C-alpha cells in the first residue's frame, strides 16, 4: 500500500511463521466450536479444491482521478466513496461514480490515509502507521472523532448482517471489530489450498464473503468469512493499456454496486475505473 520500502519488507514475510499461525488458528477454532480438528481440516480442504478461477468482463469504463493514490473504494446507494493515501496527499471524497467528487476532506500530514467503509450516517477511515482511525459524517465528511488503532491500517469493510467490521493489516489475517469501538472481537486466517495468503489489502464485504486485493498484484481473492477459505481467485490484470500502466501502480479498489452483481475496480494513480462482472475464465 505504500512505497518501495514497504514492498521489500512485506515480500520478506516468513512463510514458516504463517504456516505455524495457520495451525494454531485451526486448533483454536475447533476448540471453540467443539468440532474435531480432522473434520474441520477436511472441510477446509474440500472447499479449497473448489476454488473458482475467475476473470473480469468489462461492462463500462469511467474516468478516474490519475492523481488519486486509491486506498479504499465503496458504494453506498448511488454514491461512491474513495479514500486516498500518501502523507500530505491523503483525502476522502464522495460523489457519483466517474464524476468529480462533490465533497472532499483532506488529511493533514503526516497522516497516511488507508481503507474506508460506510456505516449508514457515518464512516470509518483508517490510517497506515499513524495508529488512529477517524470517524466521519458520511454526508459532509466532517471529522467526528478519532480512536486509537493498534495495528497497521490497510483495508476495512462492514458486514451489517453480522454487526461487525472486517479489517486487514497486510498479513494473512482478517480481524473482526466492533463497529462502534473498533475493539477486536475475533480474527480469521485466510488460506488457499491450506496455505496462508499474506498481504491482504483493500477489502469489500458482500454477504458472507470478503473480497480482498492481494498486494502488490492485480489479484483478488474471495474469502468465506466463516472459515477463512479462499473460494475464488480473480485475475484483474490487463485492464489498463501498457502506456497507462507505466505511471499507474497496482489495483487497489473494489466496490460492489448495490443491487447488482457488478463491481467497480480501480487502482493507485489509475486514470480509469471499470464497471465489471467477475466471470469464469
Q: What is the predicted role of each segment?
A:
Residues 80-87, 118, 123-130, 165-171, ...:
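Conserved beta-strand positions in repeat-built beta-propeller and related beta-rich domains
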Residues 59-91, 105-117:
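Beta-strand-rich domains and repeat architectures in extracellular enzymes and scaffolds
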Residues 61-66, 104-109, 145-151, 189-195, ...:
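Surface loop/turn motifs at the tips and blade-to-blade linkers of beta-strand repeat domains
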Residues 45-66, 97-100:
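A short helix->beta-strand "capping" segment at the edge of beta-propeller domains
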Residues 70, 200, 246-255:
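Signature of short aromatic-glycine-proline-rich micro-motifs recurring in repeat-based ectodomains
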Residues 31-33:
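Bacterial signal peptide processing site
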Residues 72-74, 115-117, 157, 204, ...:
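Conserved beta-strand position repeated across blades of beta-propeller domains
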Residues 95-99, 137-141, 179-182, 224-228, ...:
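Short loop/turn segments that connect beta-strands within beta-propeller blades
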Amino acid at each position: 500500500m505504500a512505497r518501495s520500502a514497504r514492498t521489500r519488507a512485506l515480500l520478506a514475510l516468513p512463510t514458516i511463521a504463517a504456516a505455524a499461525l495457520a495451525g494454531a488458528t485451526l486448533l483454536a477454532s475447533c476448540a471453540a466450536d467443539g468440532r474435531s480438528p480432522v473434520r474441520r481440516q477436511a472441510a477446509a480442504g474440500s472447499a479449497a479444491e473448489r476454488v473458482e478461477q475467475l476473470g473480469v468482463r468489462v461492462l463500462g469504463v469511467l474516468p478516474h482521478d490519475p492523481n488519486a493514490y486509491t486506498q479504499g473504494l465503496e458504494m453506498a446507494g448511488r454514491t461512491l466513496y474513495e479514500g486516498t493515501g500518501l502523507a500530505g496527499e491523503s483525502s476522502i471524497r464522495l460523489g457519483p461514480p466517474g464524476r468529480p467528487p462533490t465533497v472532499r476532506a483532506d488529511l493533514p500530514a503526516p497522516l497516511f490515509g488507508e481503507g474506508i467503509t460506510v456505516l449508514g450516517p457515518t464512516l470509518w477511515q483508517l490510517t497506515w502507521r499513524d495508529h488512529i482511525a477517524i470517524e466521519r459524517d458520511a454526508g459532509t465528511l466532517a471529522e467526528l472523532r478519532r480512536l486509537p488503532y493498534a495495528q497497521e491500517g490497510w483495508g476495512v469493510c462492514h458486514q451489517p448482517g453480522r454487526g461487525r467490521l472486517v479489517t486487514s493489516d497486510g498479513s494473512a489475517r482478517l480481524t473482526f471489530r466492533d463497529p462502534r469501538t473498533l475493539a477486536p472481537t475475533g480474527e480469521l486466517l485466510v488460506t488457499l489450498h491450506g496455505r496462508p495468503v499474506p498481504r491482504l489489502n483493500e477489502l469489500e464485504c458482500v454477504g458472507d464473503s470478503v473480497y480482498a486485493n492481494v498486494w502488490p498484484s492485480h489479484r483478488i481473492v474471495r474469502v468465506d468469512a466463516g472459515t477463512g477459505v479462499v473460494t475464488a481467485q480473480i485475475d484483474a490484470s490487463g485492464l489498463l493499456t501498457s502506456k497507462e500502466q507505466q505511471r499507474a501502480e497496482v489495483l487497489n479498489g473494489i466496490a460492489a454496486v448495490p443491487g447488482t452483481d457488478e463491481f467497480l475496480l480501480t487502482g493507485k494513480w489509475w486514470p480509469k475505473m471499470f464497471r465489471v462482472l467477475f466471470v469464469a475464465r
